[in-house]
Swiss-Prot record:
Similarity field: Belongs to the filoviridae membrane-associated protein VP24 family.
Primary subcellular site in the record, as a coarse category: virion
Lineage top rank: taxon: Viruses
Membrane-topology annotation of the record: Peripheral membrane protein
Keywords in alphabetical order: Host cell membrane, Host membrane, Host-virus interaction, Inhibition of host innate immune response by virus, Interferon antiviral system evasion, Membrane, Viral immunoevasion, Virion
Subunit relationships: Interacts with host importins KPNA1, KPNA5 and KPNA6. Interacts with host STAT1.
Subcellular location: Virion membrane; Host cell membrane; Host endomembrane system
Database matches in Pfam families: Filo_VP24
Function, in words: Prevents the establishment of cellular antiviral state by blocking the interferon-alpha/beta (IFN-alpha/beta) and IFN-gamma signaling pathways. Blocks the IFN-induced nuclear accumulation of host phosphorylated STAT1, by interacting with the STAT1-binding region of host importin alpha-1/KPNA1 protein, thereby inhibiting the latter. Without the activity of this protein, activated STAT1 would not enter the nucleus and be unable to activate IFN-induced genes. Plays a role in assembly of viral nucleocapsid and virion budding.
Protein name: Membrane-associated protein VP24
One Gene Ontology term, aspect cellular component: membrane
Length: 251
């Protein structure tokens, strides 16, 4: 008599690839409060987010600052002198950076459906909402996204963070200090500063920079300590740190 057995049961992908990414990891942005800020988990990556620099942004915005900071306010008038600009939380800044990392790989690689469509939806969710969960309704997307593809997505996010780490602090020498990503719906600008990354999201035409009639813009600051543990390149010497520092910047 034949007997049913489980001799050749496959090991589930999640158990086999503990360091891999499953689709639900991309659709869950988990935030846990800590003593100094928040711990964020997304796509198998963990970030420690703090509030450093946010009070300073607000003071620059309301013109409550030391005279030595005037240059910083004048350098970013569309942020600090614009009635339509809004200071956001560092959690928002992290979401924008992660969304920018997704959009960056969509532009760099010729991704086919359903992957490109799914990534666009996830990027929009990170950029336009503050919710912790995104419900991807299309089962076809879930079925066709392999563990390998999902792990590559995470690798490309880390590559984007590495790009940010190679930026120079805003300087007088014309060295690259910002990355910009444009879509039909918004323009993202991420700028390296002394404290970390100044993140801004504008209208696609960058109307916030119109001197006469500045348009709306949201901005925030993500302290550099948030991305350092994830980035691959590490500072090699104190010399590189001195070269990066710009004492003229308040942030």
């Amino acid at each position: 008599m034949a007997k049913a057995t489980g001799r050749y049961n496959l090991v589930t992908p999640k158990r086999e690839l503990e360091q891999g990414v499953v689709f639900s990891d991309l659709c869950n942005f988990l935030v846990t409060p800590t003593v100094q800020g928040w711990k964020v988990y997304w796509a198998g990556l963990e970030f420690d987010v703090n509030q450093k620099g946010i009070t300073l942004l607000n003071r620059l915005k309301v013109n409550d600052f030391a005279p030595a900071w005037a240059m910083t306010r004048n350098l970013f008038p569309h942020l600090f002198k614009n009635q339509q600009s809004e200071v956001q939380t560092p959690i928002w800044a992290l979401r924008v950076i992660l969304a920018a990392g997704i959009l960056d790989q969509l532009m760099d690689h010729s991704l086919i459906e359903p992957l490109s469509g799914a990534l666009n939806l996830i990027a929009d969710w990170l950029l336009t909402t503050s919710t912790n969960h995104f419900n991807m309704r299309t089962q076809r997307v879930k079925d066709q996204l392999s563990m390998r593809m999902l792990s590559l997505i995470r690798s490309n996010i880390i590559n984007f963070i590495n790009k940010l780490e190679t930026l120079h602090v805003v300087n007088y020498k014309g060295l690259l200090s910002s990355v910009e990503i444009g879509t039909p719906s918004y323009a993202i600008i991420i700028t390296r500063t002394n404290m970390g990354y100044l993140v801004e999201v504008q209208e696609p035409d960058k109307s916030a920079m119109d001197i006469r009639h500045p348009g709306p813009v949201k901005f925030s600051l993500l302290h550099e300590s948030t991305l350092k543990p994830v980035a691959t390149p590490k500072p090699s010497s104190i010399t590189s740190l001195i070269m990066e520092f710009n004492s003229s910047l308040a942030i």
